Amino acid sequence: MPLPPLASAGASLDRTQVERYARHVLLPQVGMSGQERLTKAKVLVVGAGGLGSPALLYLAAAGIGTIGVVDADVVETSNLQRQVIHRDADVGRLKTDSAADAVDRVNPHVTVVRYDARLDSANALDILRDYDVVLDGTDNFPTRYLVNDACVLLGKPHVWGSIYRFDGQVSVWWAEHGPCYRCVFPDPPPPGAVPSCAEGGVLGVLCAAVGSVQVAETIKLLLGIGEPLVGRLLVHDALAMTWDALTVRKDPACPVCGEHPSVTALIDYDQFCGVPAARGGASGREPEEPGEAEESQVPVVGAVSLAADLATDAPPLVVDVRGPDERSIAAIPGAVPIHLDAFRDGTAFSDYEELASRDRRIVVHCKVGGRSAEAVRLAVAAGYTDIASLGGGVLAWVREVDPTQPQY
């Protein structure tokens, strides 16, 4: 059933506002009073990336009075395929600055509050406290759990979305009326178990599909209309073009919103998720690939050094652990393709003639160094001694050795 509106009654709309929002005002569920609530509402968007982009545009168009944006990242060229608020001219700028400009282009009457810092346990409660609804567009597990716990402690709902490849999920987590994120996902996946969009890819337009649903849910919560996705998990398969709603329930044993909560203050979420401390980002940038931050734990060779070694009479064997789609974008000439999965199941050491000799020097590479570091660790455990990971992966090779190839 509908819940009480979260946005307070606002001041009367002037003539220009009525003209701008007339199609909202014509809706009986919104009307003049509802639009007045929206112009007074405050919504925080965590992450100005794939999901945050359409969300920010439609929140602005809807006339949300104040929109907060949390993101510590800068715009990169690879963002432009799906993060539609950013343009070519914005590459290198703070995402919060680019986002604020995009919101202003859509609706100059909206106030934008920028937080160009990583959302963490030290600042989350202070930032979230002033907003009616939190829209979670983050791309990493530590921040998802952080946003959830902060919202539970503050008694606020948060509208959550997630995308990967062709699949999306949306729900409204609100402990006062249903489950929180931890009720349904009590434990984070092991580090590296879930590939990032940077590793596995994502259909750009999927961001619009999921982000738009998040905005619709946000508006419903602000106005107290319709049936919000509290207690339901909406699952979208863009390839099959299906939307399924799954019932999810509150967990009485939930450590943060259950009958006897053990989490009564924010914790170290990087540690909770078993990942190294994040380095910037929407709320802490998601590593480009699993294990990226652990590259320093294995022997590493630089791209320029590798290029020099390849020009000698005794060049090392270069192994590429990426998949064929990634190799089609950028590659090191002569690299032997042996997928990381073959290192994980041991077949790399038994089924590939190239690795039959354990005396030849081997350099393993991937995109930026995370997957290759894992492969090197597995090879060392299997008895290989003269093996190293290419620091920075093929992207370092492109930057430092062969800039004719594209970055991705």
Question: Model segments located where?
Answer:
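N-terminal charged helix/coil linker that caps or initiates catalytic domains
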Residues: M1-L44, S78, L266-E288
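E1/E1-like adenylate-forming module used to activate ubiquitin-like modifiers
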Residues: P2-P5, N107-S121, L125-V213, L223, ...
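Rhodanese-like catalytic fold shared by cysteine-dependent sulfurtransferases
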Residues: L3-L6, L80, D101, A240-P252, ...
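Glycine-rich phosphate-binding loop and adjoining beta1-alpha1-beta2 segment
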Residues: P4-S12, T66-N107
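Conserved N-terminal Rossmann-fold NAD(P)-binding element of oxidoreductases
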Residues: V46-G47, V70, H365
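Hydrophobic/small residue at the entry helix of a nucleotide-binding pocket
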Residues: L51-G52, R371
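Conserved S-adenosyl-L-methionine
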Residues: A61-T66, G383-T385
